[in-house]
């Protein structure tokens, strides 16, 4: 998260700062197993990192970044990925374009155009300074469209027209706050049935995929409008169609989304106030603490 033109004045309401803009970047990296690499990635993002979620099955890590050094830390993480990772050796369940796979900027408060400007600056750095093909998403197109069409019917927006097979390409985007969320199914469920359920649950607010991960079965979601369809709603909808045995929050969620869910459901849904964006921002001195009941 970065705060542009941030003033020293705090808002009078808990959870508010008076600032021109409040941005986040949620960097998805195609590495979820190498402890030495992940330690180096933690080090180079230490000043802005709100959270890191690493998944060895998907072989993927998600870094939620915040703070005045946001763009510098994204650049440091990008250079580390391009130097240390090799897409040719990558094996994982999750679709990926490159070692630095997805770099979305998110406007949390203030002028949404600031997120697009940050995206465009980062895209130019990746393409022109680091030589990575960059596909833009947001107003231009959706991320799923890039995954379907990159290097087939869709050329990179910036950078080389062909990707180095070692590092691949990057999707650099701008989007609203979403919740990444996984549900674990009864492993005896056929994968074909899990895919049917994923298809049934997809909609304007929900992207869904089904994966067999060893002896486990997962539904993986991006909840694009979590105020409409959040973790509780997707759990209830899925449980009406298939046997669900567990849940997993990937990264963080907005406090306002948590506030909509009865606290007695937080545990089974793998949710907690300490895993809200606002709680982590407060821990970095970027925002006053926000009790979930006060989020709006």
Model regions and ranges:
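Long, contiguous binding/interaction regions
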Residues: 3, 15-296
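Short linear segments in intrinsically disordered or otherwise low-structure-confidence regions
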Residues: 9-12
């Amino acid at each position: 998260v970065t705060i542009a033109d941030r003033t020293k004045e705090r808002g009078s309401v808990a959870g508010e700062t008076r600032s021109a803009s409040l941005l986040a970047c949620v960097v998805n990296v195609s590495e979820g197993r190498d402890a030495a690499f992940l330690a180096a990635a933690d080090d180079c993002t230490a000043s802005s990192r709100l959270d890191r979620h690493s998944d060895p099955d998907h072989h993927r890590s998600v870094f939620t970044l915040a703070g005045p050094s946001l763009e510098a830390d994204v650049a440091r993480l990008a250079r580390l990925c391009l130097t240390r990772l090799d897409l040719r050796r990558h094996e994982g369940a999750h679709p990926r374009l490159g070692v630095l796979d997805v770099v979305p900027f998110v406007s949390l408060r203030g002028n949404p155009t600031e997120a697009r400007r940050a995206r465009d600056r980062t895209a130019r750095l990746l393409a022109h300074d680091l030589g990575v093909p960059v596909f833009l998403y947001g107003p231009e197109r959706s991320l799923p469209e890039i995954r379907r069409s990159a290097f087939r019917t869709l050329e990179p927006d910036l950078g080389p027209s062909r990707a180095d097979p070692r590092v691949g390409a990057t999707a650099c985007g701008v989007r609203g706050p979403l919740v990444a969320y996984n549900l674990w199914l009864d492993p005896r469920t056929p994968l074909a049935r899990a895919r049917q359920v994923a298809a049934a649950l997809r909609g304007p607010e929900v992207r869904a995929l089904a994966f067999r991960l060893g002896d486990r079965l997962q539904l993986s979601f991006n909840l694009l409008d979590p105020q409409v369809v959040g973790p509780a709603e997707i759990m209830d909808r899925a449980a009406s169609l298939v046997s669900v045995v567990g849940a997993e929050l990937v990264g963080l969620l907005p406090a306002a989304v948590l506030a909509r869910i009865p606290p007695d459901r937080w545990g089974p849904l793998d949710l907690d106030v300490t895993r809200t964006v606002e709680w982590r921002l407060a821990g970095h001195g970027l925002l006053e603490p926000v009790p979930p009941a006060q989020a709006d």
